[in-house]
A protein has these predicted regions:
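Sec-dependent bacterial lipoprotein signal peptides
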Residues: 1-17
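N-terminal leader/targeting pre-sequences
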Residues: 19-68, 73-176
Length: 176
């Protein structure tokens, strides 16, 4: 290969590399939770996914009543039945008020309502707000984190929990 051909090839490679952004990188699974009801029945799975500096929660739920259900990240990785109160309150490292409709905006544990269809299933993926490093440190702290699904919809305003009712499913987030 001549020097000129090598220079052209190297230039082309650099142009292609310059067009690749962090957003083009594939998602990496960094955590997961198996959701269960108070009676121990499977209620779905949740995954924490990383794409560059974005962390998202992907959830697939089964066996829930049709309609909207609040779901949140909770402060403690413990899902003791029957009421799952062992999971603590919402994950709120910045000590903000609850709900996307609150004047201060939502906290880390606030997620949009999960919409369950007539077939009793739901799935969604939600991006979390903040840097990936900070989010992962908060989720994988010493006492862990749980994902909780509630019986009713979150009203996005009532502090501290959104008035979403009883906790009907819970899963402890484990690092992948």
């Amino acid at each position: 290969m001549t020097l000129r051909a090598a220079a052209v090839s190297l230039s082309a490679l650099c142009l292609v590399a310059a067009c690749t952004t962090i957003d083009d990188l594939p998602e990496e699974r960094v955590g997961a939770a198996t959701l269960r009801t108070a009676s121990g029945l499977p209620a779905g799975t949740a995954q924490l996914l990383r794409n560059g500096d974005t962390i998202s929660v992907a959830i697939a739920a089964v066996g829930l009543t049709p309609g909207e259900h609040g779901f949140h990240l909770h402060t403690t990785g413990n899902c003791t039945a029957p009421d799952f109160t062992s999971a603590g309150g919402h994950l709120n490292p910045g000590n903000r008020t609850h709900g996307s409709l609150s004047p201060g905006g939502k906290h880390l544990g606030d997620l949009p309502n999960l919409v369950v269809g007539a077939n009793r299933t739901a799935s969604t993926q939600v991006d979390l707000t903040g840097s990936a490093t900070d989010i992962l440190a908060d989720i994988f702290d010493a006492d862990g984190t749980a994902i909780v699904i509630h019986a009713g919809p979150d009203d996005y305003a009532s502090d501290p929990a959104g008035d979403a009712g009883a906790r009907v499913a819970c899963g402890v987030v484990e690092a992948a």
